[in-house]
């Protein structure tokens, strides 16, 4: 499911085409590659696993009632920007009306779209299913700094912030051009399938994008370019990179039972 803002490749294209994303300035310099890791601490609880499995089944059948029944009485919503995370962790959005958890899921789902729209009940239900679907689609789970240590789906990447920023500096691009490879990727000397391979980078590698959309030498293909650790420019097809923050559903224990206690919604 990629019907919301969680389609990272589309988001990357939007950001890289914006006035806030720039091609490399000056001559890029070599840098040390950096691969993110994922923490699974606290995720082996049998009752938590059972909750996640029930949510997956509800997503498959479109059972919004089960999804909403999983909400704690109080559900926090964290709104974060797509792109490289700020150093300061966000506070949850204010909830002066103290809306119940199931209604907060509606609020979170509405944040995944742009514009101030009065959605129908049917629309909101579908958006809630999509929200959970996008969060659980990756199949990973782990503690989240953004959600103050709560366990979330998907797992949040763990990395050295200073080392990541050093990569952007070496590449001569803003930190908003940093993305995470979702799979092992070969980068070529030119935007052509016949060009020599300059480097093969592992899944989870943080890469500095130079251009989000590059026309192939044959006029075909959806290429993109990055600054490689060698400081050379490498080209690859079909960007499916990930951002540092995805739409996430987070869990905690309330009165001894696992429940959905928070939602993280990234936006432009």
What residue spans do the PLM features occupy?
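Bacterial N-terminal signal peptides that target proteins for export
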Residues: 1-9
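N-terminal signal peptide c-region/cleavage motif recognized by signal peptidases
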Residues: 17-20
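Short, low-complexity N-terminal intrinsically disordered segments enriched in polar/charged residues
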Residues: 24-57, 69, 105-106
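Short, charge-rich amphipathic alpha-helical segments embedded
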Residues: 75-93
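Boundary regions of SH3-family modules and the immediately adjacent low-complexity/disordered segments
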Residues: 109, 115-176, 225-268
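SH3/SH3-like beta-barrel superfamily modules
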Residues: 198-241
